[in-house]
Amino acid sequence: MTERRVPFSLLRSPSWEPFRDWYPAHSRLFDQAFGVPRLPDEWSQWFSAAGWPGYVRPLPAATAEGPAAVALAAPLAAPAFHRALNRQLSSGVSEIRQTADRWRVSLDVNHFAPEELTVKTKEGVVEITGKHEERQDEHGYISRCFTRKYTLPPGVDPTLVSSSLSPEGTLTVEAPLPKTATQSAEITIPVTFEARAQIGGQEAGKSEQSGAK
């Protein structure tokens, strides 16, 4: 099967700036995820709950000693946070949605300009690639590169795969699913007797009677 590159439409606003700062001025260095699925809204509640592995209960002396005691707990929470996040991302969490008639995958690529993204299909697989050379950001110099592959559902026509880029930097790749064969209504077929067989039997009986005479 030949390789096919999928063009994507831009849904950018007129004032879009590809290299503008997407995050507040106090963004941290580890807030530079790219090429990863968008995190569900429920995760923000999960991260702040006492049930997740990265949660650290404030030290008893925190109220008495002020911010210094809270700072001691922060280094303990950060590694656990990253371990839990990596476990979730490596376990197959992804924005893949499939309805009765459509297959769709969403990917956060806000660090890449449109010309730095490539979407193509080959042998029933959608491959998304993003790459930009070293450039300066608020933390220094950085270059990024990623490749993600998704298997198309059986029966999907690769030539019908399309993609679009939203103003928020979310790449959406989708394709229509093949229509299932509709089952016909139940029909009762009557059984009929062939008249020729009956006529043939009567003629054979007459010939036997004439031969006996």
From Swiss-Prot:
Residues bearing PTM N6-acetyllysine: K131
Modification Phosphothreonine, positions: T182
Keyword Hydrolase appears in the UniProt entry: no
Protein name as it appears in the record: Heat shock protein beta-1
Regions annotated as coiled coil: none
Annotated CDD domains: ACD_HspB1_like
Function: Small heat shock protein which functions as a molecular chaperone probably maintaining denatured proteins in a folding-competent state. Plays a role in stress resistance and actin organization. Through its molecular chaperone activity may regulate numerous biological processes including the phosphorylation and the axonal transport of neurofilament proteins.
Major subcellular site: cytoplasm
Cellular component GO terms held in the UniProt record: axon cytoplasm; cytoplasm; nucleus; spindle
Annotated family: Belongs to the small heat shock protein (HSP20) family.
PTM notes: Phosphorylated upon exposure to protein kinase C activators and heat shock. Phosphorylation by MAPKAPK2 and MAPKAPK3 in response to stress dissociates HSPB1 from large small heat-shock protein (sHsps) oligomers and impairs its chaperone activity and ability to protect against oxidative stress effectively. Phosphorylation by MAPKAPK5 in response to PKA stimulation induces F-actin rearrangement.
Subunit structure comment from the entry: Homooligomer. Homodimer; becomes monomeric upon activation. Heterooligomer; with HSPB6. Associates with alpha- and beta-tubulin. Interacts with TGFB1I1. Interacts with CRYAB. Interacts with HSPB8. Interacts with HSPBAP1.
Domain sHSP: 84-192
Omega-N-methylarginine modifications at: R12
UniProt lineage: Eukaryota, Metazoa, Chordata, Craniata, Vertebrata
Keywords: Acetylation, Chaperone, Cytoplasm, Cytoskeleton, Methylation, Nucleus, Phosphoprotein, Stress response
Taxonomic source organism: Cricetulus longicaudatus (Long-tailed dwarf hamster)
Phosphoserine, modified sites: S13, S15, S27, S90, S91, S94, S106, S184, S207
UniProt cross-references to PROSITE patterns, sorted A to Z: SHSP
Interaction with TGFB1I1: annotated segments: 78-213
Any one GO BP annotation for this protein: protein refolding
GO molecular function, one term: identical protein binding
